[in-house]
């Protein structure tokens, strides 16, 4: 593959000089302006996410062993030193080599050269670029500021691989910077309180994938989960006893800043606010504050309260952006309140959306008076909305594009709702720009990026990690890497590697299912239950809520809570089934397909007695039987295909109808190998 740039040469590895730093920045600027696209095979050889903007492969590899040493040069501060320590901690966990002890004593072979400081409060659009040169004998990471260093260190960690002779990193030269400046993850601590340790380890995962905005949502109808010193009844009466102290919030903000992550708070208003009214009923629109979900936007009491509250929270959160929500506001409480209706008539406010716009205008001014920029969901966008308000879109790329055409900056979340159990591929193909041909260059700049959203309506702190990871890595790549990086097969191959890497950061997504299955079964190693769990998924989108009744206190301890949103086994089997049905499969793929189908057919006999032992697993009995029957059909289809036998047309049709019934949810689960078996059946010949 032709590349447009050359290696920087040996001078890049010489002792640090300012001229070297300037030279790297200049070269990096031109290189990053014209990124080199790696083919899928080259992407796979790196095994990392996100794919960097520009990569040049070299010769050999850099060995990681007990002699490893890393030195900081140029600008230095305590944050860089902590970053070096975290880097060594992760590298030590991956290799098993106690590098955190040795690295301070060993001669350095890894040089981190930082040009200057970052902003005291991290800013939107702050430079995150870096230049990483890895050779067999030396590594040099150069960046204009600590943010770039943080990103480059994560790239190196992802490049570490085990070989027949030890741990090593391929010789490459990388020039990299993000495509979008806003690359976020929303964690909803409003529906359910999310403990600080869970928040922190997900910030570690964000650092690994170069995400840079933690959108922290604190309140909803179900609870108010942050301490207010000005209005203590908010947390005392509205939290159920679970809330973050302001000291804990400051601790998380500092933890995030160390990792190059901004923290943007969200306080959703004027709706989703029932929990506010438990302590402060005068704010409510409805007759019964305990049943009301909308703030009264016509009362002076409301704005006096919110001015003080927003001032308190704006002082607590240093980021320049403040999210005021504004979504899903049902105007029925305003319409049924005579006093509010009289206010609307007196002020020529025609309907609920217009009244919300009146409220939004006042809130935006309160936020701006605290020198913050308001962020809001799609609903806050009205013809008279101030142009500096940032729109977060749950409606989709076209809605975001229209906002950009009207002069607004925006962030996309539609397509990135990771709580809805969609596949990594579905998220991966959603681009914040949508169809970019409909936007001018200036309008494209207004699309700031996107956010994965982890709503906690039916997610607990126990299973949150396997709902967020590893699929969010696919979204992180979409937001960092070039638009043309879209090969789904390559993404999945790299996602497998990245998923394992995330374990070294303390994330628990790979362990959660097994632990929950052990509890469900009462067995220390319920192998047959794991076989079933490997090929089922929770239903997608909102179907799960239609099949099972959830409340704020529903125990999330069933199979649909335990299994990840996407079955790797089913996806891999589907790829093999496609190749078999098209006549392109290798003998090894035929063998693997037969081995899987045999395992699934025979698993039911071992699993049924286990399922009967526990009230948490009894409802899985028909799912297990279904898997056995579907697998038996698959084995017959393999025999027919291999032996070129014909199948009676009527029999095949009845078999397909059975498979279509089997594909429907049972026990709030989807049997994900059914479409693949149907593909095999449809590939057989009929008489």
List the predicted regions and their residue ranges.
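Bacterial N-terminal signal peptides
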Residues: 21-34
């Amino acid at each position: 593959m032709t590349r447009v740039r050359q290696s920087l040469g040996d001078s890049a590895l010489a002792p640090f000089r300012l001229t070297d730093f300037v030279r790297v920045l200049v070269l990096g600027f031109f290189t990053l302006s014209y990124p080199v696209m790696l083919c899928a095979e080259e992407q796979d050889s790196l095994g990392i996410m996100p794919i960097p903007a520009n990569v040049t492969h070299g010769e050999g590899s850099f060995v990681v062993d007990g002699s490893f040493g890393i030195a900081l040069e140029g600008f230095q501060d305590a944050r860089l030193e902590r970053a070096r320590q975290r880097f060594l901690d992760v590298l030590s966990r991956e290799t098993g080599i106690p590098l955190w002890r040795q690295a301070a004593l060993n001669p350095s072979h890894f040089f981190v050269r930082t040009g200057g400081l970052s902003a005291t409060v991290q800013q939107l659009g702050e430079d995150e670029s870096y230049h990483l040169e890895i050779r067999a004998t030396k590594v040099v990471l150069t960046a204009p500021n600590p943010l770039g260093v943080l990103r480059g260190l994560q790239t190196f960690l992802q490049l570490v691989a085990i070989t027949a002779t030890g741990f090593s990193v391929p010789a490459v030269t990388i020039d990299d910077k993000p495509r979008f400046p806003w690359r976020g993850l929303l964690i909803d601590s409003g529906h359910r309180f999310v403990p600080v340790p869970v928040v922190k380890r997900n910030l570690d995962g964000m650092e690994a994938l170069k995400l840079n905005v933690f959108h922290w949502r604190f309140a909803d109808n179900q609870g108010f989960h942050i301490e207010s010193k000005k209005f203590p009844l908010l947390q005392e009466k509205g939290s159920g006893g679970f809330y973050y102290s302001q000291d804990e919030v400051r601790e998380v903000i500092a933890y995030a800043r160390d990792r190059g992550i901004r923290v943007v708070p969200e306080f959703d208003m004027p709706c989703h606010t029932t929990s506010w009214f438990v302590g402060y009923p005068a704010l409510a629109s409805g007759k019964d504050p305990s049943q009301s979900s909308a703030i009264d936007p016509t009362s002076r009491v409301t704005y006096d309260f919110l001015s003080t509250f927003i001032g308190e929270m704006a002082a607590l959160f240093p980021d320049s952006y403040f999210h005021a929500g504004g979504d899903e506001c049902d105007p029925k409480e305003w319409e049924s309140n005579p006093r509010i209706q009289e206010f609307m008539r007196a002020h020529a406010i025609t309907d609920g959306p217009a009244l919300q716009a009146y409220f939004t205008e006042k809130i935006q001014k309160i936020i701006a008076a605290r020198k913050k920029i308001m962020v809001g969901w799609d609903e806050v966008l009205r013809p008279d909305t101030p142009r500096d308000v940032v729109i977060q879109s749950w409606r989709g790329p076209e809605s975001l594009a229209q906002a950009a055409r009207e002069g607004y900056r925006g962030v996309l979340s539609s397509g990135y709702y990771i709580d809805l159990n969609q596949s990594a591929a579905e998220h991966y193909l959603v681009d914040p720009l949508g169809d970019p041909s409909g936007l001018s260059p200036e309008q494209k700049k207004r699309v700031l990026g996107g956010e994965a959203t982890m709503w906690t309506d039916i997610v607990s702190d126990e299973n949150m990690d396997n709902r967020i990871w590893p699929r969010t890595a696919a979204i992180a790549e979409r937001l960092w890497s070039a638009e043309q990086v879209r090969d789904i097969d390559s993404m999945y191959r790299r996602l497998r590697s990245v998923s394992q890497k995330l374990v070294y950061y303390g994330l628990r997504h790979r362990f959660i299912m097994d632990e929950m299955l052990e509890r469900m079964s009462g067995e220390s190693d319920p192998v047959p239950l794991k076989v079933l769990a490997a090929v089922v998924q929770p239903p997608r989108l909102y179907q799960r809520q239609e099949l099972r009744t959830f409340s704020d206190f529903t125990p999330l301890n069933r199979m649909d809570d335990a299994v990840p949103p996407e079955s790797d086994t089913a996806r891999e089997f589907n790829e093999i089934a496609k190749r078999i049905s098209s006549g392109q499969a290798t003998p090894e793929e035929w063998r693997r397909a037969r081995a899987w189908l045999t395992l699934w057919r025979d698993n039911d006999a071992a699993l049924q007695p286990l399922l009967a032992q526990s009230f948490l697993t009894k409802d899985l009995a028909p799912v297990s039987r279904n898997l056995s029957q579907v697998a038996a059909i698959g084995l017959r289809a393999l025999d027919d295909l291999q032996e070129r036998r014909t199948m009676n047309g009527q029999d095949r049709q009845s078999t397909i109808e059975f498979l279509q019934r089997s594909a429907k949810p049972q026990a709030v689960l989807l049997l994900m190998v059914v479409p693949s078996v149907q593909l095999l059946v449809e590939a057989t010949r009929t008489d």
